[in-house]
A protein has these predicted regions:
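Long, low-complexity, polar and repeat-rich extracellular regions
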Residues: 1-476
Length: 476
């Protein structure tokens, strides 16, 4: 018989439930030591909490579906025969999280409060063993230390072997320490990239230019060194009586990024990639201590665009001929003609993809990789200076790791879920304000708590430098 848990159940030591049909939890199941549930199917609804101090173990022949909270202060172990679906408001926390399944889906879902993205976050280590893994639409796979993805869990609940596929689609996989991804096919891709052609700021200018008869060069007025009345011009020292005068507008257009939601794979330690087909499509792979490639290299796919120089105006041909009596020369102009030469087109990469670190290939050699930086503000391409500015993303996060405090002025607007932080405080701007004796009452509401503020800073460092840490730093 299918079991629905609609009332709170708490035990000081252990809760063990075994049900062949299945179980749906709509309330609180909490154990002081271990929580063990075994069933064909296990569903933890949005209001459901499965929690234990030492260990949470969920075992399902078919699938586990979670839109609520699954949390332990020790090991969170979930094993299924078919699927683990962590959706929308779904949160899975633990010091050590170990997942064993055939298919893992960590993704977004529409809720009454809008779109929410699921999170699986470990305080010490995250191990995922699956054949097919999909992390989608701002969903998060995270570890505050090590993270490993493979094909099966060993007796110590560590991932080993190889998964068949990992699709990280406009979502994030991150670890503060080392990361090991053993996946036959890894796809890190941007689901929401778009670009369009726009005029380059300050590129428009009016041009007067000349082309001597028989010459292939069109030279602007700065090359005119003298006039011989109205009959001749001197272009770079050459005298021309017959020439074409051009009067046109010159301007530039190029492709700019309109929208982008890159996928992120970010390691604060060494990132080891072990797979046959590795693709980084308009997204970012960053590792502070380098990237180690055990099989095939990563195919970094950038967005392609064009830069065009456009010229549009009129031309008139000037020539000198004899008068009707043949006794003197006269300057003559033909009528105006449209001047619209073919655009000068140059391919242009939009520098969306990032792949940072020196990587060690299968042959043991260490090769530098180019760091590509995103230039988010338009810059006049005619200058030699480099200007890189980043506007941080200050939109409210939809990841379920973060909550929004709309009405409580004593708390930051964005607060990390306390079940994950275990009610610990993270160093943030409030500490700095206290040290400076600044009265927060005279200031605006803080945007986020310390954990979220650190995330914003880390994201800006990555965007500005293409690196996980600033030079000279080895941690957050």
């Amino acid at each position: 018989e299918y079991l629905n848990v609609d009332s709170s159940i708490q035990a000081g030591n252990q809760i063990s439930i075994e049900n062949a049909a299945g179980l749906t939890n709509n309330n609180l199941l909490e154990a002081g030591n271990t929580l063990d549930i075994s069933a064909n199917d296990i569903k933890n609804s949005q209001k459901g909490i499965l929690q234990a101090n030492t260990k949470v173990h969920l075992s399902a022949n078919n699938q586990v579906e979670n839109t609520g909270l699954i949390n332990s202060n020790g090991l969170t172990l979930i094993e299924t025969g078919q699927k683990i679906q962590n959706l929308g408001t779904g949160q899975i926390y633990g010091d050590h999280i170990a997942l064993q399944t055939s298919q893992l889906l960590n993704a977004e879902q529409q809720t009454a409060e809008g779109t929410k993205s699921a999170v699986i976050a470990a305080r010490e280590r995250l191990d995922i063993a699956a054949q097919q893994i999909e992390n989608r639409e701002q969903a998060l796979l995270s570890s505050e230390n090590q993270l490993a993805i493979g094909g099966k869990l060993n007796q110590n609940h560590l991932a080993e072997g190889a998964a068949q596929s990992l699709d990280n689609a406009s979502a994030r996989i991150q670890s503060a320490g080392d990361m090991y991804l053993s996946v036959n096919t890894l796809t890190n891709r941007n689901l929401h990239f778009s670009s369009s052609e726009k005029e380059v700021p300050n590129s428009r200018e009016q041009v007067i230019a000349y082309q001597g008869s028989g010459s292939n060069e069109i030279l602007d007025a700065s090359h005119v060194t003298g006039w011989g009345g109205q009959e001749t011009v001197y272009l770079d020292g050459n005298r021309y009586e017959d020439y074409t005068k051009y009067d046109y507008t010159r301007y530039e257009k190029q492709d700019y990024v309109d929208s982008s939601a890159p996928a992120y794979i970010v390691s604060g330690g060494t990132l080891t990639l072990d797979g046959q087909n590795l693709s980084n499509n308009k997204s970012q792979i960053l590792a502070a201590q380098g990237i180690k490639i055990l099989q095939n290299d990563v195919d970094n796919i950038d967005a392609e665009g064009e830069h065009r120089v456009i010229q549009s105006g009129t031309s008139r041909y000037h020539y000198v001929g004899w008068n009707s009596t043949g006794t003197s020369k006269r300057s003559k102009w033909n009528g105006s003609k449209p001047y619209n030469p073919a655009d000068i087109v140059t391919p242009k990469k939009l520098n969306v993809v990032k792949y940072d670190g020196s990587y060690q290939g299968a042959n043991g050699g260490v090769n530098p990789t180019q760091i590509q930086r995103v230039q988010t503000e338009a810059v006049d391409d005619k200058t030699n200076s480099e200007i890189r500015t980043i506007t941080p993303d200050l939109s409210l996060p939809n990841q379920s790791l973060f909550g929004i405090n709309k009405n409580n002025n004593n708390e930051p607007l964005i607060e990390t879920n306390r079940a994950f932080t275990q009610y610990k405080n993270w160093l943030g701007s409030d500490y700095m304000l206290n040290m400076l004796s600044t009265d927060p009452a005279n200031m605006h509401k803080r945007l986020g708590d310390g954990y979220y503020e650190q995330k914003l800073i880390n994201d800006q460092v990555a965007q500005l430098t293409g690196k996980v840490y600033l030079d000279g730093y080895t941690n957050y």
